[in-house]
Amino acid sequence: MDYLKQQNKRNRGLEVDEDEILATNKNVIVIGGGDTANDCVGTAIRQGAKNVYQLQRSSESERDSKGASFWGKISAMTKNPVFEEGGIREYSVKPTAFSGEAGIVNKLHAIKLDENREEIADSDFEIECDLALFALGFLHPEHETLLGDLGVELDERGNVKTDEFKRTSVKGVYAAGDMRSGQSLVCKAISDRKSVV
């Protein structure tokens, strides 16, 4: 994500060569609910954004009901320190459109969702938006590549299914990191390699 890459350059005292993306004095909307979205929220707050909103489709109850299989692994997000710095997290929201003038965005249009992720009638709303950041991650690794050619078994989320030693359903083929667990932190991927046998 260019926004975070640029800030990492600034943090190291390096020059940002491309057009700068800054949140200073802006109404910022971050779309997505994972670690990258949280990093965007924190960065925008620290850059002096006027307002920062994080929007995600999932509900708080949906997150809690998934258990350790997925949301349990990221339950720490509910008490994420970045939101102690500021920012507003909105659950069960579906962005529907952006609007603006002369090619410049100034509003996000959205609608609230029910527990089945269906739109709630007459729940449309707008948020002022000067900068929109999409931190949506990915659903699963691409299946139409080597994974498909090898015929490895996939789990219910479309990730490569493994046992506790990271062995796939194909003898001699192992999987670690995001392709096995879904999008996560690089340190977890590095840790995965230690249990490959």
Located regions from the model:
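FAD-site-proximal beta/loop scaffold in flavoenzymes
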Residues: M1-N25, N116-Q183
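A structured beta-alpha segment of the ubiquitous adenosine-cofactor-binding alpha/beta core
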Residues: D17-D19, P81-I88, S92-D130
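Beta1/beta-strand and adjacent pyrophosphate-binding region of the FAD-binding site
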Residues: A23-G34
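Residue-level detector of alpha-helix initiation sites
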Residues: G34-N38, M179-R180
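Rossmann-like dinucleotide-binding cores of NAD(P)H-dependent redox enzymes
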Residues: N38-A97
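Conserved small/polar residues in nucleotide/adenosyl-binding loops
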Residues: V196-V197
